[in-house]
């Protein structure tokens, strides 16, 4: 009997809150995670599905558009220092690597691709369409490297 009451109590603890009024609102109201960097320079790499490179480039165009239209002063600085390279040769699995180079890093600025797009695109259906395109294109994030400038050979 003690075992049964324990199981029922556990079920009530997990099931009842899931069906309570307003439960979904809790997740809708949470702020998205920011992607910030502390280094002077950032290098990020993403493997993109070979048949979805056009979709990924549309997402990047949306990012550029969002940052261009942003009234946040750091957005213009982000645009000036954010470059993206597409590897000319596919990986052995066929994926295409896109390298993001950010120099200089704008301290405390949000570098999340989707957060920046969502700040400009307010229509939930359009946000979902861009997210689905981004998720469908992304095979895997490969790495993020950030750190201080060690040497500038141009000087």
Where are the predicted features?
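Positively charged n-region of N-terminal signal peptides that target proteins for export
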Residues: 1-4
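C-terminal partner/receptor-binding element of secreted or periplasmic proteins
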Residues: 118-155
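Acidic/histidine-rich, surface-exposed loop or edge segments in extracytoplasmic proteins
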Residues: 37-50
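Short amphipathic alpha-helical segments
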Residues: 52-77
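Bacterial N-terminal signal peptides
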Residues: 7-25
């Amino acid at each position: 009997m003690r075992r049964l009451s324990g199981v029922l109590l556990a079920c009530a603890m997990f099931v009842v809150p899931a069906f309570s009024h307003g439960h979904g609102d809790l997740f809708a109201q949470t702020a998205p995670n920011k992607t910030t960097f502390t280094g002077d320079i950032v290098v990020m790499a993403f493997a993109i599905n070979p048949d979805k490179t056009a979709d990924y480039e549309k997402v990047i165009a949306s990012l550029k558009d969002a940052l261009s239209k942003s009234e946040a002063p750091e957005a213009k600085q982000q645009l000036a220092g954010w470059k993206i390279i597409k590897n000319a040769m596919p990986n052995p699995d066929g994926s295409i690597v896109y390298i993001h180079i950010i120099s200089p890093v704008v301290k405390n600025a949000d570098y999340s691709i989707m957060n920046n797009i969502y700040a400009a695109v307010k229509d939930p259906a359009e946000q979902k369409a861009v997210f689905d395109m981004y998720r469908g294109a992304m095979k895997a994030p490969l790495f993020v490297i950030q750190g201080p400038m060690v040497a500038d050979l141009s000087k």
